[in-house]
Amino acid sequence: MLEKIIKQKKEEVKTLVLPVEQPFEKRSFKEALASPNRFIGLIAEVKKASPSKGLIKEDFVPVQIAKDYEAAKADAISVLTDTPFFQGENSYLSDVKRAVSIPVLRKDFIDSLQVEESRRIGADAILLIGEVLDPLHLHELYLEAGEKGMDVLVEVHDASTLEQILKVFTPDILGVNNRNLKTFETSVKQTEQIASLVPKESLLVSESGIGSLEHLTFVNEHGARAVLIGESLMRQTSQRKAIHALFRE
């Protein structure tokens, strides 16, 4: 599935026209996660669908969802902008950015031109996936994003990918995706297995498969300072109540 998505992205980039410059306030994604509202930082995701699960939320109003997340003290918001596989739109991110006061992460499959596009649509941070980009190219995009005033969440799915990246540079923010790319199954033990390789200066984020206070505590005990949660929140009627229930508040 990942290969299929990447192939589609390469086609999209060929015809990409950069949007007009718009004034957006800059917010620090890293600082928000480093000083969270709870014992662990929360990146709450605005996601309508996924390639593995199909449509997740029919009654999908991105701005209202984002406002609910902020009201429930999420530290940052992730917005899916990929259209073919996640039913996202760039406008969702821009609208969310204007509606909330916390940092916004663009979740997509980024190539060079999309780094500038991300800045123009209001992203405070972008996601770069280690399994998609070779380490040198990833580093180039990482530096480019930094020059444009954005933070970068560098995501890996396995230890070997992380080891290759660390030979080139040490990312400020490292995400371990708990989803096995071959089976698409999730396990928070993936964070445990990779955490020992994460440099102390990198802020560790655990992503995918987190749906309980026990999961939050487990990944936090193994070094995660933040989590990214999407589907388990999006499936609930009220995203605000879902966050409070997750933390048993």
From Swiss-Prot:
Which SUPFAM superfamilies does UniProt cross-reference here?
Ribulose-phoshate binding barrel
Looking at the keywords, is Amino-acid biosynthesis present?
Answer: yes
To which pathway does this protein belong? Amino-acid biosynthesis; L-tryptophan biosynthesis; L-tryptophan from chorismate: step 4/5
- Please list the GO terms describing molecular function: indole-3-glycerol-phosphate synthase activity; phosphoribosylanthranilate isomerase activity
- Record key words, sorted: Amino-acid biosynthesis, Aromatic amino acid biosynthesis, Decarboxylase, Lyase, Tryptophan biosynthesis
Catalytic activity line of the entry: 1-(2-carboxyphenylamino)-1-deoxy-D-ribulose 5-phosphate + H(+) = (1S,2R)-1-C-(indol-3-yl)glycerol 3-phosphate + CO2 + H2O
NCBIfam families given in the database record: PRK00278.2-2, PRK00278.2-4
Q: What is this protein called?
A: Indole-3-glycerol phosphate synthase
Organism of origin: Bacillus subtilis (strain 168)
